[in-house]
Structures are given as structure tokens and as C-alpha cells.
């Protein structure tokens, strides 16, 4: 206990003294400390259930002697042969489930969690992280309207472990620690992916994959920021030269003086280009204003970007160029586009009342109804044509549980798609859920849907959820009721129905 408290105090001091830590780049000595594995084991025991922990292989084989034996083998010159000797002795034993390997994984995760934020702090990018899903759409409504091109980017999900080692080499200058990390990562034959739901790895391995994936995405965003800054400065110089040249061509007949005298007075006319970036997991969107030639240049630049910085080839269809004013794109289960809105404005003057048209742009989030119907059909709620069917797997539940499950699903769907402009899609989804619930109860009780309507009063079922939330201020409530669109900033996870949509677009 004293050793663990001592190492925790030591780690806190290292986090406080970031400048000293930047100079001490030698991390290879940390895996040889016994306290690291004690802290990792204590942390894993708090996250896991005690009943499951007692039956686990790590709990049975974890001891101080095991840690000392592991550290002794790490000090060997050819430690890999000794480290996996027991695993290779039995062909049926999987080296990924070896207790030594799990201990090393926990220790490596702890080291990277402590030191990676400090290294990232040194080159912090300028992107702002938002926890709410709907806050991304609010940002896009404010910023994307002035952009005419977007780059729909699908970041590669699968990574080779050697790519991550090369990323570490830019931040960590400790060669032995890199060799140790390479030895651990190369033990997993499967590529590293960001989707842990389909990953065959254990909890410890998934924690390492998430940590490495976040580090990889940070490097990508950091390099994009630096590249855009360089491009912004070059674009400003180019705009300045073009303004000066136009001014020089107009005044050359009347003013006789050197060109460099004029160029120093027109810097206020230049305007830096602006880029807007949004990302959720591996799906990111770049929006900017420029010409078609500039947009193609940016697409070609990003295609070569991964090959140069991350040593991997990206398929061209993963970076799709679209003109935002004409095309729409899919993001987080919505179909997003821009539409023009014409408002007639009447100005009051002394003699007449002229009517002018004010043209504005607004973001149009649309529900992909047909794709959602396909997702509901795979879930057993309806057919591919949208006809409701009974959920046969739920007929063994009680009536209250069936009503509660349909209630929860409808609430999540309604609140997630409350910001769409086509409310008729929500009404059609409500129709599917209502009749699917009625047919499920009718199938359970072996009756007709008409009897179920009368018994459970399903005519009023789910009707209350279509009402807008009441606001505290009545005047504000009257103002917002006619807009019929709401963004809920407490939604922090994507709706399960949209996961299949993301897989289709990926």
C-alpha cells in the first residue's frame, strides 16, 4: 500500500512538472518498477466486478513473485523468447491471454495515459472538443453557411501497429521503450481498429486500442492545423500581390513612383481564408470557401497526406469532394444540405412602401427515412416496405416491459431527430412503432390489434412525446413553438439506428 501511494504521489508530481518531464524522455525504466503493475492491477480491479475478477486468470496468477519474474525476464537481452516460452510450449494456448502479457498491457496503458497527455499538451491543436452530439449541428448551422465546398473524409479505421510506433517516434525519443512497445503491439496479428464493438480483444486490449486510436487522430488533426496555417499565410500574400497589381495597373498612367511604395499600404484589404472542421470518430468534414481548383488541390493534398506522414495508402473514395450549395452529405444519421430562403421585407418611406426580397441561407437537416426503415426492418420492427410487424423476440416479456421498451426506443429516436426540418418523417416512424407495439401485444395474447387498442388505450400511446418541451418563460415559449426544431444538448451518444447508416457510408 505504501509503495502504491508513493508511486501515485510521484506520478502527480510528474504531471505538475511538465517542463521537467519534457527533458526526461527516458520511459524504458518505468516498466521495470513493481509499483506500476500494482497500480494497474488495483485500477483494473476497481473497474471489474469482484465476482468476475476472482474467476479470472489474471487474479489467480497475479502475485508479487509473478511481477518480479516478469521484470527479471524483461531485463534479459532476448526477453521475447523467454517471455513467450510458456505460450509456445502449448500450441493451444493463446499468447494474447497469457498473464504476463496482460500485466504488460496494463502497465503500458498506465504509462501512455500518464505521459501522452503531457506530450500532447506541448503541441495542443486549436480544435475545440464538444461533448454533445447536437452541438455539432449548431456549430455547422453557424459556420458552414459561408462555405461552398466540403471534403467528406473517412479516416481509415484499421491501422498497422508499425504506423503507431512511427507516430510515437516523433514524440517519444526513448528507443528501448519503442522497441518494447513494438514487441507488445506486434503480438496482435489483427490490425488496430477504432470500433471496439467488433474487436475480438479483451477489455485491457480494447483500452489500449482506444488510447492508440485517440493518439493517432490527434496527430492527424495537429498536422492538418499546421498545414492550414501555412496555406493561410501563403493565401494572404497571394491576395496582397493581386490587389497591389490591380491597383498598380490602374494608376500607372497617372502616378509615377516605385511599386513597393504602394504595396505597403494595402494590407488591410486582404482576407485570410477560413476552414471549418467537424469530426465524430472516423468521420470528419472539412468546409471552406474557394474555387474548384483549390478544392481539388486540397483533396489531392490529403490523399498524399496519409502516405507521407502515416505511411499508408488511402483509397480515393474515402475523400469525397462536394459543392455544398448543390449537394448534400450524410453526417451522424442526418442528411445535411443548404437551401435558400426568400423573405419579403417592406420598407416604410415617406412616399411609398417598397418591397424587397431578402435572400438567406440555412442548414437543412433531413431524416433519411428510407435508410431508417431498412434499419428497423433488420431489427424486426417492420418490413423493407415500412409495414409494421410484431417483434417476436419480445413476446416472452411482460406487457409493461414491452411498452417500456417501445417507449424508450421512440424517445431516443424522437429526441435525436428533433432538429430535422421534415417532421413528417417522425410521424411515419411513430406509425411504425405504434403498430409494431400493438401487433407484438396481440401476438402475445393471441388476439387482434383492435382488442389491444381497447385494452391498453394505445390510441394515446406515444402521442405525448410529440409535444415540444415547455419552456420556463412563456414569451420565449411562444417564440419557439412555431420553429418546430429543437437541439438537445444533453445527447452525448449517437442513436443506435444510425450506426448502420454510418457503416453503409463508411
Swiss-Prot record:
UniProt entry keywords in alphabetical sequence: Chloroplast, mRNA processing, Plastid, RNA-binding, tRNA processing
Subcellular location, principal: plastid
**Some GO term, biological process aspect, for this entry: which one?**
mRNA processing
InterPro entries registered for this protein in UniProt: Domain_X, Maturase_MatK, Maturase_MatK_N
Q: Does the keyword Endoplasmic reticulum apply?
A: no
Molecular functions (GO terms): RNA binding
Q: What is one cellular component GO term in this UniProt entry?
A: chloroplast
Record carries keyword RNA-binding: yes
Compartment annotation: Plastid, Chloroplast
Q: Which domain of life is it from?
A: Eukaryota
Instruction: Give the family, as the similarity comment puts it.
Output: Belongs to the intron maturase 2 family. MatK subfamily.
Record function comment: Usually encoded in the trnK tRNA gene intron. Probably assists in splicing its own and other chloroplast group II introns.
Kindly provide the name given to this protein in its UniProt entry. Maturase K
Provenance organism: Angiopteris evecta
Question: What taxonomic ancestry is recorded?
Answer: Eukaryota, Viridiplantae, Streptophyta, Embryophyta, Tracheophyta
What is the gene called? Answer: matK
